[in-house]
C-alpha cells in the first residue's frame, strides 16, 4: 500500500513537472512571437535611419563612418579617412565609388543583402528565421530570403526596451561576415534626397568636391 502511494505521488510529481515545463515553453514561445512581431513592425514601419558605425570585416579589422537610409531603396554609406570608399543606392542601382582613384562600380539593388532594410514593404513572410535568441534586454534574430538564399543571411541585434536597432551582421554563403555596430542612431529624421544622388567621379571637374 505504501509503495502504491509512493508510486502515485511520483506520477503526480512528474506530471506537475511536465505541466510546469509546458507552461514555461508556451510562455516563452508567446514572448518570442510578440518580440518577433515588434521587430517585424520596426523593420516595416521606419522611414529613415541615420547613424554612425564601426564596421568589422571578417578578420576583425575596423573601419568607421556614417550610414543614411531612406526608404524606399535609398542608402548612403560614407567611410571616414583613410578609407576613401563611398556606397550610394539611389533606389534603382548601387554605386561603389572610390573617391581617391575616382573609380565607380555599379550593381543591382537586388545584389546586396542589406536590401531588407531598404524595402518599403518588408514582410517576414518573405524570409526564413534561421536563429532567434533573447538574453536580458538584447534580441538577436537571423533571417535569410526564401527566394535569394545565395545572398546569405543577415543578423539583426536589437535592444528590447525600448525597441532600438544596435547592430547587424551580414553573413555571406562563403562563410565570411561583416559586422556593423551602430551609434548615435536617429530614426525617421528628415534626409535630403541629394544625399542619395549617384555622381560619376570621373565626370566631376578637377578640383571640385561633391
What are these language model-derived features?
Residues 1-13:
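N-terminal secretory signal peptides that target proteins for export/translocation
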Residues 13-22:
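Sec-dependent signal peptide recognition
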Residues 21-30:
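Hydrophobic h-region of N-terminal signal peptides that target proteins for export
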Residues 30-37:
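Cleaved targeting-peptide boundary
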Residues 41-60, 68:
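A short, Trp-centered hydrophobic/proline-enriched beta-strand micro-motif
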Residues 51-53, 75-79, 94-97, 141, ...:
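Short hydrophobic/aromatic-rich beta-strand segments that constitute the beta-sheet cores
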Residues 66-116, 178:
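An acidic-aromatic
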Residues 125-208:
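Gly/Pro-enriched, hydrophobic low-complexity segments
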